[in-house]
Amino acid sequence: MKNKEIIINNYLNLENNYIKLPKKLFSEQNPSEVPSTNLVVFNESLASDLGLSEEFLQSDDGINFLSGNKILEDTIPIAQAYAGHQFGHFTMLGDGRAILLGELKSQNGERFDIQLKGSGRTPYSRGGDGKATLGAMLREYIISEGMHGLGIPTTRSLAVVSTGEDVIREEILKGAVLTRIAKSHIRVGTFQFISNYGTIEELKALADYTLNRHLKKAEYEGNPYIYLLNEVIKSQAKLISKWQLVGFVHGVMNTDNVTISGETIDYGPCAFMDVYDPDTVFSSIDINGRYAYGNQPKIGVWNLARFAETLLPLLDEDLESAVEIAQNSISKYSDLYNKYWYTGMRAKLGIFNEKEEDKELIQSLLTMMKRFKADYTNTFSNLTLGNLSDIDMFASKEFKMWYEVWKERLKSQNQSSEESKMLMEKSNPTIIPRNNRVEEALVAAIKDSDYSVMQSLLDVLKNPYDYSSINEYYSIVPKSTSCTYKTYCGT
């Protein structure tokens, strides 16, 4: 491994416990050096939350650290190995352009990974150059921070540094490195890798590390690996329900993009739905709609079944019994997902308690929204405001009948209309990272080096549930529909 310039580490207390795992799970790898560095965007609030020195990170040494030009003393950067099912096909993968610099403990004792994306080739790069484009890294920064503002578990973005490099794709583009923060980068694909290429002892070592890092041992009795499986199923059911509730389409739900921590990861071909349509697909390579908006819950359980398969040797010594345990756990996913999603949809309609007829109320509204091509976000925010003039569907006889049924449902509960409105305000964002506004910010940044448009967008995305000062510019529905917007796996 090539020697790197060292920064005397008086600012960040990084560890790397991952290297205590079997060595086939990673490769020691320094980031590549870049010709020039410019700190394009820096997340001061995240740095503060993590207890990081903002002064150091914005200094010359700090920017060199964030670009990969320098590493901290006594740290061992690594690239992680993993496998995965990509569009249903199993393949060997790994960090092809990402380097894990280390782990830090936040002020409340929680452990986080610090990873550089676009930091050069690794042993897992296959034919790639290991680099990333400025546009793709800024896009991940915007959308991941938007997801955080929406209250959805996600990896975070600490900084983007432009590198002065030309990155060759279909055209020559500006290069950049993004600093990603995650509770960990352990994926379903990590378990698939060790299950296929390691021993049972190595699988157990990974599972034990995961339990120690993400779950409290005191919380379970009996077989800890059954507990691990059940907790991952629960966290993924909850995560995907949150995606559905805000109209988020991930676009590349391969098993290597399913985190054990329950965080959203990989913002390549993702986007937010404008017009409500379960068949919405944005990814240019998802030609069969495998990862369409309406398919995401089903893909979630498919991915979790792949995770359960990796744990079979740890669930029970008898294979038949292990399979039965796994199937029993997986069978709980549907009820868990429906519980989280219906609870969320009731909240979007100001409903506190549960009644069976709520399902029909919710589904009939969604059916109307699809037929009238209603904007998903604005339908619910306008219902929250009581504004029934801005959406064509609201003038229909069918909607007026639905509206009366909904109002009667609200009257049937103990909470007041004001309490229902407050619940709706907490559940229905007025602002999402709309595709047209994200693109507008990226064009200004990349073509004109004007980052003010992006900063304005980031500012409003911090408070998407603020009904006291709605910024209409960011809530206007674009004239073109969701179907015309295409995304690419740039990140």
Swiss-Prot record:
Keyword flag Transferase: yes
EC class name: transferase
Binding annotation for Mg(2+): N257, D266
Catalytic reaction(s) noted: L-seryl-[protein] + ATP = 3-O-(5'-adenylyl)-L-seryl-[protein] + diphosphate; L-threonyl-[protein] + ATP = 3-O-(5'-adenylyl)-L-threonyl-[protein] + diphosphate; L-tyrosyl-[protein] + ATP = O-(5'-adenylyl)-L-tyrosyl-[protein] + diphosphate; L-histidyl-[protein] + UTP = N(tele)-(5'-uridylyl)-L-histidyl-[protein] + diphosphate
Protein keywords: ATP-binding, Magnesium, Manganese, Metal-binding, Nucleotide-binding, Nucleotidyltransferase, Transferase
Keyword Nucleotide-binding included in the entry's annotation: yes
Cofactor: Mg(2+); Mn(2+)
The protein's Enzyme Commission number: 2.7.7.-, 2.7.7.108
One Pfam family named in its UniProt record: SelO
Function: Nucleotidyltransferase involved in the post-translational modification of proteins. It can catalyze the addition of adenosine monophosphate (AMP) or uridine monophosphate (UMP) to a protein, resulting in modifications known as AMPylation and UMPylation.
Record-stated family: Belongs to the SELO family.
UniProt xrefs under NCBIfam families: PRK00029.1
Name of the protein described by the UniProt record: Protein nucleotidyltransferase YdiU
Organism: Clostridium botulinum (strain Alaska E43 / Type E3)
UniProt gene name: ydiU
